[in-house]
Protein backbone atom coordinates (compact mmCIF):
# COMPACT_ATOMS: atom_id res chain seq x y z
CA UNK A 1 0.00 0.00 0.00
CA UNK A 2 2.99 2.31 0.20
CA UNK A 3 2.41 3.38 -3.38
CA UNK A 4 -0.97 4.80 -2.37
CA UNK A 5 0.31 6.66 0.68
CA UNK A 6 1.85 9.61 -1.15
CA UNK A 7 0.82 12.37 1.27
CA UNK A 8 3.75 13.61 3.39
CA UNK A 9 1.71 12.97 6.55
CA UNK A 10 1.80 9.23 5.84
CA UNK A 11 5.59 9.16 6.25
CA UNK A 12 5.70 6.48 3.58
CA UNK A 13 3.88 4.05 5.92
CA UNK A 14 7.31 3.51 7.47
CA UNK A 15 6.41 4.95 10.88
CA UNK A 16 3.87 4.05 13.57
CA UNK A 17 1.82 7.24 13.12
CA UNK A 18 0.68 9.67 10.49
CA UNK A 19 1.65 13.27 11.24
CA UNK A 20 -0.44 16.04 9.71
CA UNK A 21 0.92 19.55 10.21
CA UNK A 22 -1.80 22.06 11.11
CA UNK A 23 -0.37 25.51 11.64
CA UNK A 24 2.08 25.51 14.52
CA UNK A 25 0.89 22.11 15.79
CA UNK A 26 0.63 18.60 14.36
CA UNK A 27 -2.24 16.13 14.40
CA UNK A 28 -0.85 12.66 15.12
CA UNK A 29 -2.95 9.63 14.13
CA UNK A 30 -2.38 5.92 14.67
CA UNK A 31 -4.41 2.75 14.26
CA UNK A 32 -3.75 -0.70 15.71
CA UNK A 33 -5.72 -3.94 15.53
CA UNK A 34 -5.87 -6.78 18.06
CA UNK A 35 -6.88 -10.28 16.94
CA UNK A 36 -8.07 -12.97 19.33
CA UNK A 37 -5.60 -15.83 19.46
CA UNK A 38 -2.75 -13.64 18.20
CA UNK A 39 -2.64 -10.48 20.31
CA UNK A 40 -4.75 -11.73 23.22
CA UNK A 41 -5.71 -15.15 24.51
CA UNK A 42 -9.07 -16.78 23.73
CA UNK A 43 -11.21 -16.39 26.84
CA UNK A 44 -9.08 -13.57 28.25
CA UNK A 45 -10.90 -11.04 30.43
CA UNK A 46 -12.53 -8.55 27.99
CA UNK A 47 -11.73 -5.70 30.39
CA UNK A 48 -8.03 -6.46 30.01
CA UNK A 49 -8.41 -6.67 26.23
CA UNK A 50 -10.01 -3.22 26.20
CA UNK A 51 -7.14 -1.85 28.28
CA UNK A 52 -4.51 -3.32 25.97
CA UNK A 53 -6.29 -2.06 22.85
CA UNK A 54 -6.25 1.53 24.09
CA UNK A 55 -2.83 1.47 25.77
CA UNK A 56 -1.02 0.07 22.73
CA UNK A 57 -2.40 2.84 20.53
CA UNK A 58 -1.57 5.52 23.08
CA UNK A 59 1.95 4.10 23.25
CA UNK A 60 2.37 5.03 19.57
CA UNK A 61 1.36 8.58 20.46
CA UNK A 62 3.85 8.54 23.34
CA UNK A 63 6.64 7.79 20.87
CA UNK A 64 5.71 11.02 19.07
CA UNK A 65 5.52 13.08 22.25
CA UNK A 66 1.85 13.66 21.47
CA UNK A 67 -1.00 14.52 23.84
CA UNK A 68 -3.99 12.18 23.29
CA UNK A 69 -7.15 13.90 22.07
CA UNK A 70 -9.49 10.92 21.70
CA UNK A 71 -10.08 7.51 20.15
CA UNK A 72 -12.36 5.86 17.59
CA UNK A 73 -13.29 2.21 18.22
CA UNK A 74 -14.04 -0.57 15.75
CA UNK A 75 -15.69 -3.24 17.92
CA UNK A 76 -16.71 -6.78 17.01
CA UNK A 77 -19.32 -8.02 19.46
CA UNK A 78 -17.97 -10.68 21.81
CA UNK A 79 -19.01 -13.01 24.61
CA UNK A 80 -19.09 -10.40 27.40
CA UNK A 81 -19.60 -6.94 25.93
CA UNK A 82 -20.49 -5.25 29.27
CA UNK A 83 -17.16 -6.41 30.68
CA UNK A 84 -15.33 -4.94 27.67
CA UNK A 85 -17.16 -1.63 28.13
CA UNK A 86 -16.19 -1.59 31.81
CA UNK A 87 -12.54 -2.06 30.90
CA UNK A 88 -12.78 0.57 28.19
CA UNK A 89 -14.20 3.06 30.66
CA UNK A 90 -11.40 2.25 33.11
CA UNK A 91 -8.54 2.75 30.64
CA UNK A 92 -10.01 5.89 29.07
CA UNK A 93 -10.49 7.38 32.53
CA UNK A 94 -6.95 6.40 33.54
CA UNK A 95 -5.43 8.31 30.62
CA UNK A 96 -8.01 11.10 30.51
CA UNK A 97 -9.00 10.24 26.93
CA UNK A 98 -12.45 10.49 25.31
CA UNK A 99 -14.23 7.98 23.07
CA UNK A 100 -15.18 10.08 20.04
CA UNK A 101 -16.97 7.47 17.91
CA UNK A 102 -16.46 4.32 15.87
CA UNK A 103 -18.43 1.31 14.67
CA UNK A 104 -19.83 -1.94 16.08
CA UNK A 105 -20.32 -5.17 14.10
CA UNK A 106 -21.37 -8.74 14.73
CA UNK A 107 -19.36 -11.52 13.07
CA UNK A 108 -18.37 -15.15 13.49
CA UNK A 109 -14.84 -16.32 14.15
CA UNK A 110 -12.05 -14.87 16.29
CA UNK A 111 -12.77 -11.40 17.65
CA UNK A 112 -11.04 -8.56 15.79
CA UNK A 113 -10.80 -5.13 17.42
CA UNK A 114 -9.46 -1.90 15.98
CA UNK A 115 -8.76 1.48 17.52
CA UNK A 116 -7.68 4.80 16.06
CA UNK A 117 -6.03 7.25 18.44
CA UNK A 118 -5.66 10.96 17.72
CA UNK A 119 -3.11 13.18 19.40
CA UNK A 120 -1.62 16.65 19.27
CA UNK A 121 2.09 17.44 19.09
CA UNK A 122 3.30 20.96 19.78
CA UNK A 123 6.97 20.52 18.86
CA UNK A 124 8.73 20.20 15.50
CA UNK A 125 9.92 17.92 14.15
CA UNK A 126 7.65 15.21 15.53
CA UNK A 127 9.96 12.22 16.25
CA UNK A 128 10.07 9.32 13.82
CA UNK A 129 11.92 6.03 13.54
CA UNK A 130 14.37 7.75 11.22
CA UNK A 131 16.85 10.40 12.32
CA UNK A 132 19.45 8.50 14.36
CA UNK A 133 22.95 9.69 13.49
CA UNK A 134 26.49 8.38 13.77
CA UNK A 135 27.71 9.09 17.30
CA UNK A 136 24.27 9.14 18.91
CA UNK A 137 23.72 6.98 21.97
CA UNK A 138 20.88 4.46 22.21
CA UNK A 139 18.56 4.54 25.22
CA UNK A 140 15.58 2.63 26.61
CA UNK A 141 13.20 3.80 29.33
CA UNK A 142 12.97 0.55 31.28
CA UNK A 143 13.29 -3.23 31.39
CA UNK A 144 12.12 -5.65 28.72
CA UNK A 145 10.75 -9.12 29.32
CA UNK A 146 8.04 -8.25 31.85
CA UNK A 147 5.27 -8.98 29.34
CA UNK A 148 6.83 -12.36 28.57
CA UNK A 149 6.69 -13.33 32.23
CA UNK A 150 3.17 -11.92 32.45
CA UNK A 151 1.93 -14.04 29.56
CA UNK A 152 3.47 -17.16 31.04
CA UNK A 153 1.84 -16.40 34.40
CA UNK A 154 -1.53 -15.84 32.74
CA UNK A 155 -1.27 -19.10 30.81
CA UNK A 156 -0.28 -20.96 33.97
CA UNK A 157 -3.07 -19.35 35.98
CA UNK A 158 -0.60 -18.35 38.68
CA UNK A 159 1.68 -15.37 39.31
CA UNK A 160 1.87 -11.71 38.31
CA UNK A 161 0.47 -11.09 34.82
CA UNK A 162 -0.28 -7.35 34.88
CA UNK A 163 2.56 -6.38 32.53
CA UNK A 164 1.03 -8.50 29.76
CA UNK A 165 -2.63 -7.80 30.51
CA UNK A 166 -2.40 -4.07 31.15
CA UNK A 167 0.62 -2.44 29.49
CA UNK A 168 1.36 1.20 30.19
CA UNK A 169 1.66 3.97 27.61
CA UNK A 170 4.59 6.19 28.62
CA UNK A 171 2.99 9.47 27.59
CA UNK A 172 4.78 11.71 30.09
CA UNK A 173 8.17 10.28 29.18
CA UNK A 174 7.49 10.65 25.46
CA UNK A 175 6.39 14.26 25.90
CA UNK A 176 9.58 15.06 27.85
CA UNK A 177 11.85 13.29 25.36
CA UNK A 178 10.37 14.53 22.09
CA UNK A 179 12.20 17.89 21.87
CA UNK A 180 15.61 16.21 22.30
CA UNK A 181 15.59 12.81 20.58
CA UNK A 182 16.93 12.20 17.09
CA UNK A 183 14.62 9.17 16.71
CA UNK A 184 12.12 7.33 18.91
CA UNK A 185 9.67 4.41 18.82
CA UNK A 186 7.97 2.11 21.29
CA UNK A 187 9.16 -1.47 21.77
CA UNK A 188 6.14 -3.52 20.76
CA UNK A 189 7.63 -6.37 18.70
CA UNK A 190 10.86 -7.06 20.58
CA UNK A 191 13.85 -4.85 21.37
CA UNK A 192 16.19 -6.42 18.82
CA UNK A 193 13.66 -6.28 16.00
CA UNK A 194 12.54 -2.74 16.76
CA UNK A 195 16.12 -1.54 17.12
CA UNK A 196 16.91 -3.09 13.75
CA UNK A 197 13.91 -1.31 12.23
CA UNK A 198 14.99 2.04 13.65
CA UNK A 199 18.52 1.55 12.35
CA UNK A 200 17.25 0.65 8.88
CA UNK A 201 14.96 3.68 8.81
CA UNK A 202 17.87 5.90 9.84
CA UNK A 203 20.39 4.28 7.43
CA UNK A 204 22.80 3.55 10.29
CA UNK A 205 23.97 0.60 12.37
CA UNK A 206 22.92 0.19 15.99
CA UNK A 207 25.53 -1.40 18.27
CA UNK A 208 23.87 -2.66 21.46
CA UNK A 209 25.68 -4.07 24.48
CA UNK A 210 23.63 -6.96 25.79
CA UNK A 211 24.60 -6.50 29.43
CA UNK A 212 23.50 -2.85 29.37
CA UNK A 213 19.89 -3.69 28.57
CA UNK A 214 17.70 -3.80 31.70
CA UNK A 215 15.59 -6.96 31.86
CA UNK A 216 12.68 -8.13 33.99
CA UNK A 217 13.47 -11.82 33.51
CA UNK A 218 16.11 -13.93 35.25
CA UNK A 219 19.54 -13.51 33.67
CA UNK A 220 19.31 -16.99 32.13
CA UNK A 221 16.43 -15.72 29.99
CA UNK A 222 18.09 -12.50 28.83
CA UNK A 223 17.98 -13.58 25.19
CA UNK A 224 14.24 -14.23 25.43
CA UNK A 225 13.68 -10.81 27.00
CA UNK A 226 15.55 -9.04 24.18
CA UNK A 227 13.38 -10.71 21.53
CA UNK A 228 9.97 -10.65 23.20
CA UNK A 229 7.47 -7.87 22.52
CA UNK A 230 4.57 -6.18 24.32
CA UNK A 231 6.74 -4.22 26.78
CA UNK A 232 6.07 -0.77 25.26
CA UNK A 233 9.20 0.84 26.61
CA UNK A 234 10.44 3.80 24.58
CA UNK A 235 13.56 3.20 22.50
CA UNK A 236 15.30 6.41 21.46
CA UNK A 237 18.56 8.00 20.40
CA UNK A 238 20.14 11.20 21.66
CA UNK A 239 23.24 13.10 20.54
CA UNK A 240 26.32 11.60 22.15
CA UNK A 241 26.84 14.49 24.58
CA UNK A 242 23.22 14.53 25.82
CA UNK A 243 21.89 12.78 28.91
CA UNK A 244 18.32 11.52 28.97
CA UNK A 245 15.83 13.98 30.54
CA UNK A 246 13.87 11.01 31.94
CA UNK A 247 15.07 7.89 33.78
CA UNK A 248 16.51 5.59 31.11
CA UNK A 249 19.38 3.21 30.39
CA UNK A 250 22.01 3.81 27.73
CA UNK A 251 22.36 0.49 25.89
CA UNK A 252 24.59 1.26 22.92
CA UNK A 253 25.84 3.62 20.26
CA UNK A 254 24.99 4.47 16.66
CA UNK A 255 27.59 3.82 13.95
CA UNK A 256 27.70 4.69 10.29
CA UNK A 257 25.80 2.17 8.19
CA UNK A 258 27.64 -1.14 7.96
CA UNK A 259 26.81 -4.54 6.46
CA UNK A 260 24.24 -5.21 9.22
CA UNK A 261 21.71 -2.77 10.72
CA UNK A 262 22.15 -4.24 14.21
CA UNK A 263 25.11 -5.49 16.19
CA UNK A 264 24.74 -7.25 19.54
CA UNK A 265 28.03 -7.34 21.46
CA UNK A 266 29.78 -6.57 18.18
CA UNK A 267 28.11 -9.26 16.05
CA UNK A 268 24.86 -9.44 14.03
CA UNK A 269 22.34 -11.39 16.15
CA UNK A 270 21.17 -14.68 14.69
CA UNK A 271 17.71 -16.18 14.59
CA UNK A 272 14.35 -14.48 14.89
CA UNK A 273 14.74 -10.99 16.35
CA UNK A 274 11.13 -10.51 17.48
CA UNK A 275 7.51 -10.70 16.43
CA UNK A 276 7.13 -10.34 12.66
CA UNK A 277 3.70 -9.20 11.44
What are these regions (language model features)?
Residues 46-70, 83-94, 172, 176, ...:
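Small-aliphatic-rich amphipathic alpha-helix that forms the alpha element of a beta-alpha
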Residues 77-100, 105-113, 118-121, 179-180, ...:
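Glycine-/charge-enriched secondary-structure boundary and capping motifs
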Residues 23-27, 34, 67-150:
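Glycine-rich anion-binding loops of enzyme active sites
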Residues 10-12, 20-23, 64, 105-110, ...:
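Solvent-exposed alpha-helices and their adjacent loops that cap or buttress functional pockets
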Residues 133-142, 166-191:
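Internal active-site segments that recognize and position negatively charged phosphoryl groups
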Residues 146-166:
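Short, compositionally biased
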Residues 7-9, 17-18, 89, 100-106, ...:
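A generic local secondary-structure boundary/capping motif
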Residues 1-55, 59:
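N-terminal glycine-rich phosphate/pyrophosphate-binding loops that anchor nucleotide-derived ligands
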